[in-house]
C-alpha cells in the first residue's frame, strides 16, 4: 500500500474553507484512490481564492509526476452594489462625495483663469498625495471593482470582469489583468532615471510633496490607471484614441467617455501634458490625441455611477478628484467650444439622466418610442464609431421609424443645455 498525505492550504484559503480526509491510502493491487473534499461556506466575503493540492514526500521508489495543482474556488459571499457595470450603466445611484467648497474657486471663471483654478485644486501641493506604484493594484481592486461581484474587477477595453486575484505577477499576461496607463506611459516624459516603487505600503503612506510640475507622479496617478486585460493593454500600447485605437473588435464603447475624462484630467493636473487633435507621435512626449474624438466621446458616453464610485475611491487615496467626472460639462469650458464662457456649477448640475428618458423596445427592429421627456428635445443617433446617422425633434411618447442596419448605436437626447446618451441595439 502507498500512504499519501496532502495539503490544500494556499494563502487565505485554509482549513476553515474545507473539510475532508487529507490522508489517503492506495491499496496493494490498485492504482487509484478517491477522497471527497467539501468546500465550506464560511460566510465571509474573502473574494475568490486558489486551493493548491500539494502532495507530501513519497517513498524513494515512487516519483510524483503531477503536484501543486491549483483549483479556483469562487466565493459566493460577494457583495453586489446598487449601481450597474459600464455595459449596464446607471446614473445618480452612487453619491458624489465632493467635499463642501471643493470647486468653489472655479465659479465665475473662464479661459486660462478657469484652467488654472482647476489645476490649483487637483495639483494642490498642500493636500494632494502621491501613492506608490505598488499600491495601484490595491487601489484598482477597490476603484475598478465589478459592481455585480466584489470579488472581481472590471477590465476597461475588454468590457468584462475578471477575478481580482488574476492580476499579473510575472512576465505572463495570458489570462491576467494589469494596470493600463490611459495617458500612455511612454508619452508622459518621465525621466529615465525614475524607478517606480513597486512595494505597496498602504493608504497611510504617501509622498509628502507634489505639484503640477511633478511629472513622476503621473506614473502612479490612479485617475488614469485602469484594470485591463494584459493582452489588450499590449494591443493598445501607446496608440492615440479614435484616430488609431478604438478598442477590441465588437466592443460597445462603454469605456470611451471614461478615457476621455481621464485624459482631460491629466492635461490639467500636469503642466507638461497636452491633448491635441490628430495622431501625434510618441516623441516628443507630452502629447496625446485625438482631442476632437475625446470631446465627442465625453458627450456620447456620459459619466455613470461606476466612474463616480472610482472618483470617490481615488479621492480617499490621493485627496484629489477628477472634476470632469463630477462635472462632465466642464470639459467644454476648458477644451471645447465654451472656453470664452463663464463657468457656473449651478447651471451645469441639471442631470438629464435623472429625467429618465426611455427608449423602447430595446433591442428594437425598425421602430422605437421615446418616453420620459418633459419638453421638445433633439434626438441624434450615432454609430459606435461616432458617425451621426439620424436626427429628429421629439416630444414625449414620440414614435420613430428607423431604417438602420443591425448593430449597436448611441442615441443622444438633448433638451436645452443638458443631454443624456443611451445605447440602442438594432436587431
Question: Residue locations for each model-derived region?
Answer:
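Domain-level detector of nuclease and nuclease-like folds
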Residues: 171-345
Amino acid at each position: 500500500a502507498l500512504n499519501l498525505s496532502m495539503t490544500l492550504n494556499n494563502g487565505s484559503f485554509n482549513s476553515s474553507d474545507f473539510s475532508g480526509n487529507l490522508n489517503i491510502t492506495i491499496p496493494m493491487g490498485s492504482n487509484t484512490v478517491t477522497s471527497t473534499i467539501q468546500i465550506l461556506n464560511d460566510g465571509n466575503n474573502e473574494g475568490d481564492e486558489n486551493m493548491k493540492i500539494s502532495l507530501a514526500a513519497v517513498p524513494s521508489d515512487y516519483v510524483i509526476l503531477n503536484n501543486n495543482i491549483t483549483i479556483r474556488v469562487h466565493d459566493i459571499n460577494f457583495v453586489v452594489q446598487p449601481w450597474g457595470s459600464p455595459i449596464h450603466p446607471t446614473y445618480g445611484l452612487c453619491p458624489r462625495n465632493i467635499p463642501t467648497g471643493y470647486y468653489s474657486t472655479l465659479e465665475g471663471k473662464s479661459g486660462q483663469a478657469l484652467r488654472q483654478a482647476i489645476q490649483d485644486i487637483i495639483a494642490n501641493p498642500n493636500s494632494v498625495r502621491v501613492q506608490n506604484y505598488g499600491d495601484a493594484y490595491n487601489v484598482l481592486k477597490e476603484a475598478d471593482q465589478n459592481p455585480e461581484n466584489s470579488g472581481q474587477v472590471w477590465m476597461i477595453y475588454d468590457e468584462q470582469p475578471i477575478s481580482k486575484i488574476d492580476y499579473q505577477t510575472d512576465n505572463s499576461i495570458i489570462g491576467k489583468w494589469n494596470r493600463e496607463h490611459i495617458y500612455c506611459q511612454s508619452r508622459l516624459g518621465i525621466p529615465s532615471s525614475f524607478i517606480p516603487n513597486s512595494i505597496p505600503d498602504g493608504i497611510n503612506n504617501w509622498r509628502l510633496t507634489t505639484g503640477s510640475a511633478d511629472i513622476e507622479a503621473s506614473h502612479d496617478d490612479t485617475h488614469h490607471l485602469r484594470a485591463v486585460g494584459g493582452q489588450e493593454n499590449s494591443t493598445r500600447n501607446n496608440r492615440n484614441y479614435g484616430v488609431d485605437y478604438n478598442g477590441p473588435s465588437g466592443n460597445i464603447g462603454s469605456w470611451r467617455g471614461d478615457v476621455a475624462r481621464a485624459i482631460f484630467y491629466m492635461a490639467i493636473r500636469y503642466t507638461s501634458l497636452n491633448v491635441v487633435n490628430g495622431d501625434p507621435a510618441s516623441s516628443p512626449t507630452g502629447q496625446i490625441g485625438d482631442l476632437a474624438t475625446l470631446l465627442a466621446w465625453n458627450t456620447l458616453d456620459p459619466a455613470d455611477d461606476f466612474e463616480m464610485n472610482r472618483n470617490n475611491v481615488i479621492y480617499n487615496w490621493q485627496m484629489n478628484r477628477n472634476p470632469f467626472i463630477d462635472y462632465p460639462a466642464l470639459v467644454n469650458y476648458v477644451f471645447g467650444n465654451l472656453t470664452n464662457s463663464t463657468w457656473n456649477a449651478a447651471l451645469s448640475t441639471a442631470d438629464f439622466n435623472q429625467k429618465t428618458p426611455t427608449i423602447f423596445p430595446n433591442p428594437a427592429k425598425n421602430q422605437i418610442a421615446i418616453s420620459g421627456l418633459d419638453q421638445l428635445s433633439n434626438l441624434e443617433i450615432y454609430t459606435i464609431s461616432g458617425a451621426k446617422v439620424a436626427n429628429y425633434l421629439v416630444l414625449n411618447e414620440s414614435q420613430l421609424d428607423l431604417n438602420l442596419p443591425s448593430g449597436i448605436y448611441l442615441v443622444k437626447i438633448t433638451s436645452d443645455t443638458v443631454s443624456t446618451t443611451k445605447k440602442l441595439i438594432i436587431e
